[in-house]
């Protein structure tokens, strides 16, 4: 052992002074440093718990992100990985995973169950899917915060005891957020996890598909709860009084469900409650005065229920209220005077009730924070309340549909933020004064004053409007006021106006051409006036209707509040409509206009609706109308138009309504595309029209351009007709003889040598041998289930009776479909393609070969094809029961034959066929034109998707939509109007519309009013929002005992038609959901909702 003294002495010189190190000493120091580094490196590698690391690697292997992939590497300490945190214990266990908004897709693997110390898991706002692992919630028994919101997790919650790690039955979980997923099933009181979540403070499962009753037992198991959100699900039954046991509850949200019964009075004993959100249910009863005990309440929203009675008189005790929305109920009485004590109100909506009395008793001046005030569609009387002019923060106010009197006061100018103001359908007077004052509202963008100021004269002087008047006005409506005078010249100064409604007045004079100079005007209604003269050509220079780019550039920054701007349709009930949904439109119907329809109308290529009915227009229908490729409605009825209906109008693929009744038109009605679907009544009143839906033959002599004298016969003409008839018959006989001979010369094994030319009109004639023509043999694929080995064009023509009109069984975007009956009795469906498709013709053979390989039990099989000169023919399986459209809309007895099990099976079959196209078939196929007429039914009503793949076949998300292939009106996804790209999610939207057709029995365009577009979808959303989902169902399906299943399907359909394509499910999800819905009768008879009338 070395003596301490000697040791001190030996190292003393080294400490006291620096001497050059010997080589041996340098080597020693380097080795020492290296060993220390290796030691710390080994320690570093050992920081991450190996079991946790493996679990995380397994997790990363199950997820992916094209946007922001995880860069987790086993060579790096997992505690340093992005989104991962570890504790400070010797084991260095993972305690936190935070990977929100990373674009992750894939499943959540069961490996996360091995993270035994995990206290926080946040995977929100990703694209994760699939079920949650069994035992997931109870296995993670250290979890404090769980956030899986905004994903696509499906299935039931794994709420039972884990089969993995044990638990003492107590879970420290504090926050659970599973909102905005696809979860379903009931939340039962037998849940081990929820029964043991004593410290739970926040539980959010909104925007899923949970069923059963609200799990009120949670208030007993988790007395610390402060937030419960069950909104946007399918919960049913009553609200339980057990919810009152959540004594600390500050937020209770259960809106947009199927809850019924009364609001339990016990809920009004929750002293901390700040938000009570229960709209769009079927709640009934009265609002008990005990609600005034909720003195901390800031939000009370009970709209779209069946609540009746009066608003509690002491409502003013809720002095902290910022949002009070009780609209669309059956409330009666007057607005309590005490409401003025709710001085913090920002939103007050009492629209569509049965409230009455005068408004002057309410001191609105105390609402200094009020921004939105909606008292429309009640029965308020008396003077217009002047105290509203003191609400300095007001941006929108509606008093429409009441019985208010008086005049607009100059005090309205004190509302400097006012943007939306409508008081239509009241008894206001002094239009000139109102316009003089309101033009000073600098931010006013929407002004609707319809059905007021009766029989007054509109100020017409151009100088009436100041140079700075109405600087922001975009929506202007003074319809149905019976105003007199001419169209006021000062309107030319409204340079930002987009929507103008002057209908149902008594305006005289001519339509001023300067209307066509308003740069943003896309919606003009001059209907039901006494206007005379001709249509000015300048009117058809509206920039917003000439260019899609100009139309898209309109600002549309007005407030999105529902309005009624259609007073001229007195035969229908008033309906609320979003201003942004108004289609590009010109209504000039029922006036006294004369002259011709200017050819300049063809410049308005953005126009969706053109209605000129009920005038005295003469001349012909301009062929230039065919340039309006977005046109949906064209009504020229009740005029003096003559000549023929332009055949070019058949190219308007969006056209869903066409009416030329009661004119003097002549000649054949165009056939093909939508013209085969327009009703006969839309062509009546034109004695010289023939063909088409009139089913009358067109006699060439009947429409001769040479006018015959009375009782006289032109002998030259008769001689010419006789000679022509003689030579025509002779030529036909010769051709028939040649065809018979050619048929006899063709042996069955040499049928490919038969050469026949198919003309555009469907007739055929022999072609000289040796001519360079394409094959005339019909090529049948190996998947053909028919015993037909050889089939020639001649036999196909014979089977269709030369494509006779009597054999037409369908009409698609590419041409007509004929029934072909072969000699052996076999029936086929023959689609004869029409038009010039350019690139598609060059690739026709290759594309149909690809289509023939698409084999699925729910796809109409392509049996064969033929290419011959300009003719393109496809051979399909014949479906005995025709199309779904026929059974739903055309056959009067059809809907009754489609009971609920049949309709559900049709949805299941069609969705399966579409899923095959989207996910299995190679290349994937975007259908582009899913509609009820493209879903065919066999003899057992099994569904088959038809017309698939006739558009260009390329990979998903890269399919450009052309005017020929964009789809059918009513089924077209909204995003197709912004980016002309067909997508898989676009198909899902269209299929959602088909589902709504099956549920409602209505056409996609059947319920819309002249100023609304694609309204089956909007109508269904409105009915759901107003708490009346059962009322959308086909009356033939109601009270069938299947209401629960139908409501589930309705929810699925509504997800499919979501305006945001990214929020739509994929078609496989739809298939899975539909498979889980049973059609048997529901034993729980649902209470029928009361009729609600929205005036």
UniProtKB/Swiss-Prot annotation:
Keyword NADP in record: no
Residues annotated for ATP binding in this entry: 809-817, 831
Family annotation (SMART domains): LRR_TYP, S_TKc
Catalysis performed (reactions): L-seryl-[protein] + ATP = O-phospho-L-seryl-[protein] + ADP + H(+); L-threonyl-[protein] + ATP = O-phospho-L-threonyl-[protein] + ADP + H(+)
PROSITE patterns, sorted: LRR, PROTEIN_KINASE_ATP, PROTEIN_KINASE_DOM, PROTEIN_KINASE_ST
UniProt-listed Pfam families: LRR_1, LRRNT_2, PK_Tyr_Ser-Thr
Glycosylated residues, chain numbering: 62, 73, 165, 199, 204, 207, 258, 341, 377, 430, 569, 592, 616, 627, 640, 662, 714
InterPro entries: Kinase-like_dom_sf, Leu-rich_rpt, Leu-rich_rpt_typical-subtyp, LRR_dom_sf, LRR_N_plant-typ, Plant_LRR-RLKs, Prot_kinase_dom, Protein_kinase_ATP_BS
Location (main, coarse): membrane
Record-level Gene Ontology MF annotations: ATP binding; identical protein binding; peptide receptor activity; protein serine kinase activity; protein serine/threonine kinase activity; transmembrane signaling receptor activity
Localization in the cell: Cell membrane
Function of the molecule: Tyrosine-sulfated glycopeptide receptor with a serine/threonine-protein kinase activity. Regulates, in response to tyrosine-sulfated glycopeptide binding, a signaling cascade involved in cellular proliferation and plant growth. Not involved in PSK perception. Involved in plant immunity, with antagonistic effects on bacterial and fungal resistances. Mediates activation of the plasma membrane H(+)-ATPase by PSY1.
Protein name: Tyrosine-sulfated glycopeptide receptor 1
